[in-house]
Amino acid sequence: DLILSPYINIEKNEARSTMRLIDSNPDLRRNILLTKINTDLREIIKNKETTYRLSNLMVLYNNMLQSLFNSQISTLGASIVILSIMFFILFRSFKIVFIALVANVTPIFLLFGIMGWLNIPLDIMTITIAAIAIGIAVDDTIHFIHRFEEEFKFDKDYVNAMRRSHRGIGHAMYYTTIIIVIGFSILMLSNLVPTIYFGLLTGIIMINVLAADLLLLPKLLLMFKPYEKLKEITK
């Protein structure tokens, strides 16, 4: 009884099977493994009256991670919609909305590409980086576009406005990003691997955001020329 009682309950007609695996294996894909186990059990258990349930810390952690992953996707989608509305209210231009969204979303896609290239998995720490990045990117984007619009009013020249904007606000954005990167890089001294990844990837996304706001954003403004109406009004 001492041996069988943890695994078999005759009164409730229940049985428990235990399986051990190395959860720290970097090649382990928990969600794929659990899905495969569920699929195999459905094929093996033909009796419709027989039910089964997977449990343990790995199942709990995987469910929590999948829930967080799905919530992050929905949150990012909602953030893009809200940002579109906010950009339109601030700048009253669909071109500006498109330009600002491209400049904000591109660094996030680039980050996920780097994570895939380096085989860095999504976990509780790394999955929140996108939300942090888009929050900081929006702030820099609004500052640059507003400064660009103010500089454009002087001579109605896109190239000169871009140069003055870089001289005026570019330095502040650059030094702010450097300070943030240095601050988050301290996390790389941690002994916890997810914390190390968080510090490393946050620094990378901050550099991506700075590059997008100082290189991609001005280029998009020069390409799409969103202030042509302002140019015509002043004439």
Where are the predicted features?
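General structural signal for secondary-structure boundaries
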Residues: 10, 25-26, 48
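Extracytoplasmic
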Residues: 1-22, 63
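Solvent-exposed, non-transmembrane alpha-helical starts
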Residues: 24-35
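Soluble non-transmembrane domains of integral membrane proteins
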Residues: 35-43
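A general structural motif
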Residues: 1-2, 33, 69
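Generic structural hydrophobic/aromatic packing signal, biased to beta-strands
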Residues: 17, 37, 54-55
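Membrane-embedded transmembrane helical bundles of large multi-pass transporters/channels
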Residues: 42-235
